[in-house]
A protein has these predicted regions:
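Metal-dependent nucleic-acid phosphoesterase active-site entry motif
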Residues: 1-18
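PIN-domain endoribonuclease scaffold, especially VapC-family toxins
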Residues: 3, 22-88, 98-106, 117-132
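Conserved glycosyltransferase catalytic-site signature
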Residues: 7, 39, 93-94
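Short, hydrophobic/amphipathic alpha-helical patches that form generic packing surfaces
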Residues: 10, 94, 98-99
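Generic, ordered loop/turn and secondary-structure boundary motif
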Residues: 11-14, 92, 117
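Conserved residues at the C-terminal ends of beta-strands
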Residues: 111
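Flexible glycine-rich beta->alpha loop in the catalytic core of nucleotide-sugar glycosyltransferases
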Residues: 114
């Protein structure tokens, strides 16, 4: 599966007590190559899980691959930040929107539909838990 990983998915995958853990495990079983993400998502995930070592293991074991350098996309990130200023987007979301622009056929795996239904290039394809 070629996709982009958001924080909510990674937190659900790493926390067996998360309400979406079973869903995240099912998604992870379908992963055949590392999911694309960014350093901001990894930092958020480490914060929410309170476990940097686990997040580093996600990278080391090939679940995810940081595929984005902020400095290389700073102009576009600033444009996106201005465009969505009313939503107060965080850096992780801005980076994922940019990743989705760079990889338009890759859905974003997320538990955060409220933001990703607003952030759009045309329509950002999403994979999310049922019922969201």
């Amino acid at each position: 599966m070629k996709a982009i990983a958001d924080t909510g998915f990674l937190v659900a995958f790493g926390n067996r007590n998360d309400r979406y853990h079973a869903w995240a495990l099912g998604i992870a079983e379908r992963v055949t190559e590392p999911l694309l993400t960014c350093d901001a998502v990894l930092a958020e995930t480490a914060f929410h899980l309170a476990d940097s070592a686990l997040v580093l293991a996600f990278v080391r074991e090939g679940l995810v691959r940081p595929a984005f350098v902020v400095a290389e996309h700073i102009s576009r990130l600033a444009e996106l930040a201005a465009r969505y200023a009313d939503r107060r987007p965080d850096l992780a979301d801005l980076c994922l929107v940019r990743l989705s622009e760079l990889h338009p056929k890759h859905p974003v795996i997320t538990t955060d539909l409220s933001d990703f239904r607003v952030y759009r290039r045309d329509v950002i394809p999403l994979i999310h838990p049922p019922g969201l």
